[in-house]
Amino acid sequence: MAGHEVRYGKHRTRRSFSRINEVLDLPNLIEIQTDSFQDFLDTGLREVFEDVLPISNFTDTMELEFVGYEFKEPKYTLEEARIHDASYSAPIFVTFRLVNKETGEIKTQEVFFGDFPIMTEMGTFIINGGERIIVSQLVRSPGVYFNDKVDKNGKVGYGSTVIPNRGAWLELETDAKDIAYTRIDRTRKIPFTTLVRALGFSGDDEILDIFGDSELVRNTIEKDIHKNPSDSRTDEALKEIYERLRPGEPKTADSSRSLLIARFFDARRYDLAAVGRYKINKKLNVKTRLLNQIIAENLVDSETGEILVEAGTEMTRDVIESIEAHIDGDLNKFVYTPNDYAVVTEPVVLQKFKVQSPLDPDKVVTIVGNATPDDKVRALTPADILAEMSYFLNLSEGIGKVDDIDHLGNRRIRAVGELLANQFRIGLARMERNVRERMSVQDNDVLTPQQIINIRPVTAAVKEFFGSSQLSQFMDQHNPLSELSHKRRLSALGPGGLTRDRAGYEVRDVHYTHYGRMCPIETPEGPNIGLINNLSSFGHLNKYGFIQTPYRKVDRATGVVTNEIVWLTADEEDEFTVAQANSKLNEDGTFAEEIVMGRHQGNNQEFAASTVDFVDVSPKQVVAVATACIPFLENDDSNRALMGANMQRQAVPLIDPKAPFVGTGMEYQAAHDSGAAVIAQHDGKVVFSDAEKVEVRREDGSLDVYHVTKFRRSNSGTAYNQRTLVKVGDIVEKGDFIADGPSMEKGEMALGQNPVVAYMTWEGYNFEDAVIMSERLVKEDVYTSVHLEEFESETRDTKLGPEEITREVPNVGEEALRDLDEMGIIRIGAEVKEGDILVGKVTPKGEKDLSAEERLLHAIFGDKSREVRDTSLRVPHGGDGIVRDVKIFTRANGDELQSGVNMLVRVYIAQKRKIKVGDKMAGRHGNKGVVSRIVPVEDMPYLPDGTPVDIMLNPLGVPSRMNIGQVMELHLGMAARNLGIHIATPVFDGATAEDLWDTVAEAGMDSDAKTILYDGRTGEPFDNRVSVGVMYMIKLHHMVDDKLHARSVGPYSLVTQQPLGGKAQFGGQRFGEMEVWALEAYGASNVLQEILTYKSDDVTGRLKAYEAITKGKPIPKPGVPESFRVLVKELQSLGLDMRVLDEDDNEVELRDLDEGEDDDVMHVDDLEKAREKQAQETPEVSENSEEK
C-alpha cells in the first residue's frame, strides 16, 4: 500500500502520500487579526495617548496629563448585539491628571471615553449588528529609498527619498549636468548644498570635508553661489528654502528656521515610527556600505593607537565582523559643530570612512554614516540627512545599491491594531485643539478634566473608520473558507495605499520575496489583480509589520539540517541561500546529494550543499490556505489554480456536505481556525448534548456551556447552521470539535460533494463547459442549500398620524390574511408566495375635500377605510419560502430604535434551493461550468456494474486549460471510493504518478483507469473507453434564482424618464447604440421606433399605449422621447436658440416638466428607496403621473 495513515482530529483518518517530514505545525490561521488587536489593547492605545498628551494651554500654566485607561464589561453579549443591530463594544474609561503649574494643584479624574468596538474570538467585529472585518493593508515602509533613472541620452542619474510615517518628504536627485538638487515636500528643487548650509555647515571647504571631493559636489557648489553678501551663507540658504516652501511670503531666516524644525526635527509633526528609524539605520549603517570595498586609510583604535585594518585591505564580511565592536563604538566618529545661525545648533556626530572608488582605484571616496541614533529618535536628525546625501553621492561612484520598492523588505503590513491606533490618534489630535482652547478660556480654579475634554472627535473618528473605511469590510461569509481567507487578506488599496488606476504592472506582479510570505496564486481576477493578496500559510508578522516566513536552520559546521526554526523577513533572507523543502536528507539529517536546488535573492538554481544556510519548512509555505486546499496543484496551470482558489470561497453551504475523498490534509486546520465551528475551550467530559447546546464538565468540576447556532442568516444570505458532533459521555480535549459549522463534516472543511463524474460529450449539451447532471442529485438533495432572506417593516409617526401594524388591511380578502396573527404579522412556519402579506400595515392618508353628502355618510357609517392606505410588507419577486422566524422590536420592550420609529418587525424567510439548470458548478481546479440539462437517472450513462454517472463534463475543457490536476483527482477519487478510504495529497508533496497507479491497481480498477460506459437510453456501450471517477464538485453562489429577472411596469429615472437598470431596481434591459445599429442594418424601422419611444421615454405615448392595450384599441402614434427634450433644454441652457419644427415648419411645443410631476418617478441615485418601494408596493405603482 502506498502512503501512510494520518489522523485529523478525532473523527477522520486519511491516507497521506506526503513524504516530507514537517517539523513545524501551521500557526493559528487568524492570528494576524487577533494578535494585532491584542497588541493594540495592551500597548498601542497607551502609545497613542502618550504621543498626544500632555497638553498645555497657550500660557503654559495648566497641563493635562494621561495616567491610564481601562475597558469595562461590554454592554451587550455577542448574540444580543446581533439581534439588536448594536455594536459589540466595551466602554473605555481614561484617567487624566490636570496640573495647575502656578498653584501646584492637581486634579485626577476618570473620564468616559466612548464605546470601543471589541474583536470577537473569531477575529471579526460586530458593528450595528453586522459582522465586519478590518483587512490588513500592504503599504510602503517608511525609510530612505534610493533609485536610478536613465535619461533620454542614456545617462544614468540617481535619486533618493526619505519617506516618513507622517510628515514631509525629503528628496535628492541629479540632473543632466551632474548637479545634485534637493526637494522639500515636493516643492521646487534647490542645490543640495543649500540645505547643508542651512544645517550650519556653510563653508565650501567644510562641505568638501564632510562629503569628500567629488565632481557632483564641486559642480553643485559652483551652481550654489553667494548672491547676497550682507547675509551669512546660512541665513541666505535658509531664506532660499523658505521661498521654495512658502512662495510669496516675506522671508526671514528665523521664520525659515522654525519652519524647517517643524517640518523635519519636531517629533510631533514628523514621525518615522519605529520601523522608519530601523530602516534608516539599517540602510545608512556603515557596516553594510563598507562590505567588499577596499579601505583607503588605516583604521586606528582611538584609545590604544593600534592599527585595526591597514589601508588597501578588502573589507570582507569576516574583516568587518572582526572590528564590529569598534565600528559600533567610537571608530572614525567625528563631531561637527554647526554655526550659530543653523537650524539645529547641537553638535552632529558622523562616522566617516575613506575607501577606493570601484570605478577608479586612484580616487578616494568618503562614506558618511549617521552614527546610528537610538531607536527612540522618531524625528529626522541632521546626521541622517548628511548620511543620506553621502549614500546618494556614493551611488555615482559605484558604492551602495538602489532599492526595489516592490521588495517585501520595503513593503510592510498595517494590521488592525495599527490602523485603529492611527484613527484614534487622528481623533485625539482633533480633541487636543479643542482642549487647549478650553484650558485657555476658562477659569483655572474650577476646571476639571471632565469639563475640558470633549470625546466626540475621538468617537466620531473610530465610528467613521468602522463604518465607512475602505478597509472595514462586510465579512465574506459564504462559507468558513471565505471567512478565513477574508481575515488573512492583504490589500494594497485604501487610505495611504495605492489606487487601482495608478497601480502599474510591477506592483501587481509576483516578486521573489513573496515566497512563503504572500500567495502567488490567490488574488482576484480583474482590476484588483495583484493589489489584493493573501498571506501564505506560514506567514507571520514581526514587530515592525514585515512578513516573516519560517526556515529550518542548517548547521554549517556539521552540514546537518536541524529542527531549529528561524523566522526571516525578506531583507534578512537576501543574505542567505535557502534549499527547497523536498531536498533529500540522510538519516543523520545531512543532505543526501552534493548539489541541491535552492534560492538566493531572485535566483533559483543549483547550489553546493555546503553553501546552504536554511531549508524550507514545508512545501505548502509558498501558498495561501485556499490554494493549499487544491489537490494536485502542482499539475495545474497557475491561471486556473487562481480560479480554483477563488471559487472555493464562493461555495454555498449544502444541507448534507461531504468532505472530499481526495483532500490535501489542509481541510481540518482550515475548518478548525475559521471560527465557524464550536471548539472546546477546556478538557472535560460531555454531560449533556442536544441540537442547541452542549455541556462539558471540567476536571475541576466547573461546567462549560457551548451554544450551537441553528439556521442563522449569514452575511451572504446562506444558512449558518452548526451540527453537534459529540454525545453524552464523550471525553473532549481543549481544541476538539464540539460542533461542525456550515460546510463542514466531521471537523473537516466540506464545501461540496463527491459525485461520480465522466469526461464525455452527450448530445452537445456540455458545449462550452456546460455541465450535464443526473436527476438523482436533485431528488436526493445532494446539492440542496438553504437560503435565508430578511425583510423588515417599521411603523413611523407621519404628519397625518402614526402608521399602524394591523390585520385590518383595506381592500384585501380574508384569503390573503389567513396566515396573519391578530396583530397582522405572519405566523412562523407559514408558506408564502410572491405578493403575500408578511406584515399588515396601514398609513394615514390625507383627507380629500369631500362633498357634503359624502361627509354625512362618513359621519353615519364611520367608514374609516377611506382614511388609510395599505403599505403592508409583501413578499417580493423571487422571495417565496417558509417563514423561519419573526422578531418584533418596540420602544415599550426597551429596544433601541431610530428616532421616529415606533415598532420594527423583522421576518426571516427560508428557501430550500435544489440545483437547477442555470446554476454554476465548479471543481477545485478552476473548471467551472453552468448546469445545462438535468437528465433522468435512467437516461444517464452507466458503469458496467450498473452505477449511473452523476455528472458529465466536456473533455475539451482540459487540454487547452492545462489543469491536469482534475484528471488525476478523478482517478484517485474513484480508487478512494472503491477502497472506502479518504486520501490526503498535500500540495507539492502529494501522490506521484506511481502512487496514483498503485492505488488504482489496489482498488481493482483497469490499468488505464478508464471504463466502458453504456448509454442509459439504448443500453449500447459507447465506442470508446471513458475516464470516469469521483471528483469533488461544489455549487457556487451564482444561482439562477438570484439572476433571473423580468420587468413589467416599473420605476423610471427622474431626468431622462427612461426605465432604471438592474434587478434590484426592477429595471429594464438596456438597448444600447450597437443594438440600435443592428436594427438599422435590418431596416426594422417600426421595431426601432417603438423601442426608442413607447418602451423607453415617450412619456405620453407609453401611457396611451398602455391604455390602448388594456382597452383593446389600436395603439396611437408615438410622440417625442423625453431624452430628446432634455437635449433641447440642455442646448437652450447653453444659450443656443434651439427650436424643433415639424414638416410644415411649425414649431413643435415641448412640454415643460411640471411641478409635482415626480411623485412616483424616481431618481437613478435613489436605489435604496427603490428597493423599499419595490418591497412595499405592488409593481403597478409607477405608472406615470400623467394619468392623474
Curated annotation (Swiss-Prot):
Q: Which UniProt keywords apply?
A: DNA-directed RNA polymerase, Nucleotidyltransferase, Transcription, Transferase
Composition-biased stretches, type Basic and acidic residues, lie in 1161-1175
**What cellular component terms from Gene Ontology apply here?**
DNA-directed RNA polymerase complex
Instruction: Look at the named UniProt entry and state the broad enzyme category this protein falls under.
Output: transferase
Q: Which PROSITE patterns match?
A: RNA_POL_BETA (PS01166)
- The answer to keyword Mitochondrion applying to this record is no
- Give the top-rank taxon of the lineage listed in the UniProt record for this protein: Bacteria
Region described as Disordered = 1149-1188
Classification via Pfam families: RNA_pol_Rpb2_1, RNA_pol_Rpb2_2, RNA_pol_Rpb2_3, RNA_pol_Rpb2_45, RNA_pol_Rpb2_6, RNA_pol_Rpb2_7
Q: Which Gene3D superfamilies does this one have?
A: 2.40.50.100, 2.40.50.150, 3.90.1100.10, DNA-directed RNA polymerase, beta subunit, external 1 domain, DNA-directed RNA polymerase, subunit 2, domain 6, RNA polymerase alpha subunit dimerisation domain, RNA polymerase Rpb2, domain 2
Which GO terms label this protein's molecular function in UniProt?
A: DNA binding; DNA-directed RNA polymerase activity; ribonucleoside binding
Can you supply a Gene Ontology BP term from the record?
Answer: DNA-templated transcription
Question: Can you state the subunit structure given in the record?
Answer: The RNAP catalytic core consists of 2 alpha, 1 beta, 1 beta' and 1 omega subunit. When a sigma factor is associated with the core the holoenzyme is formed, which can initiate transcription.
Described by its record, this protein's role is as follows: DNA-dependent RNA polymerase catalyzes the transcription of DNA into RNA using the four ribonucleoside triphosphates as substrates.
Family to which this protein belongs: Belongs to the RNA polymerase beta chain family.
The protein's name in its UniProt record: DNA-directed RNA polymerase subunit beta
Q: Which organism is it from?
A: Streptococcus uberis (strain ATCC BAA-854 / 0140J)
